[in-house]
Amino acid sequence: MATELTWHDVLADEKQQPYFINTLHTVAGERQSGITVYPPQKDVFNAFRFTELGDVKVVILGQDPYHGPGQAHGLAFSVRPGIAPPPSLVNIYKELEASIPGFVRPAHGYLESWARQGVLLLNTVLTVRAGQAHSHASLGWETFTDKVISLINQHREGVVFLLWGSHAQKKGAIIDPQRHHILKAPHPSPLSAHRGFFGCNHFALTNQWLEQHGEKTIDWTPVLPAESE
């Protein structure tokens, strides 16, 4: 059953913690000193803006944001309209083509329509320096996103967690498998997709689970906002 609690309700205290204030301060300081940080400040918390706590049905965990120009906008694996889908997302699309009847790979990589259906696209680190992968690891974001996962675990039931790769699987170790449905596979990156991400069937299995539990299934075809109006 959907909870009426919002992210604001459950995260207000966390956002007052010294570590979190320090994280924001460090990131703001880098931006002010002229370092390019992705995503833009206004997009850092988009995962929570597009998917309210009470609407979360599925969680897909990423690592840190894309670090190329114009890519990251606060949703894991997603890129802005007009930016070519990166290799991991191309592999996600390949798996969707293989497992979801009628799925046609889009030319874009903008996944907001997933987020608006209850798919929380959560990176474990929410910012990155331009061109430097993992440059904001250990700034405190991991503590914050651990808290987010524990709050979903506590306040929601029957959420499907898609944990791709060892990083996501370690991060998801706190999830109670009695309360939630956990699906694991290798990461969709070209380095590991052939080791079991292809053929994992996670998108079809997610919809099966949702249907069995009386929830609306996810339309996995990403739609640009203008197309959905």
From Swiss-Prot:
Active site per the UniProt annotation: D64
Listed EC numbers: 3.2.2.27
One of the record's GO cellular component terms: cytoplasm
Compartments it resides in: Cytoplasm
A GO BP annotation: base-excision repair, AP site formation via deaminated base removal
Protein's UniProt keywords contain Transmembrane: no
Record's keyword terms, sorted: Cytoplasm, DNA damage, DNA repair, Hydrolase
Top EC class, one word: hydrolase
Organism superkingdom: Bacteria
Catalytic activity annotation: Hydrolyzes single-stranded DNA or mismatched double-stranded DNA and polynucleotides, releasing free uracil
Gene Ontology molecular functions: uracil DNA N-glycosylase activity
Chief location: cytoplasm
Protein family (similarity comment): Belongs to the uracil-DNA glycosylase (UDG) superfamily. UNG family.
Function noted in UniProt: Excises uracil residues from the DNA which can arise as a result of misincorporation of dUMP residues by DNA polymerase or due to deamination of cytosine.
NCBIfam families documented for this protein: PRK05254.1-1, PRK05254.1-2, PRK05254.1-4, PRK05254.1-5, ung
Protein name per the record: Uracil-DNA glycosylase
Organism expressing this protein natively: Salmonella agona (strain SL483)
Lineage: Bacteria, Pseudomonadati, Pseudomonadota, Gammaproteobacteria, Enterobacterales
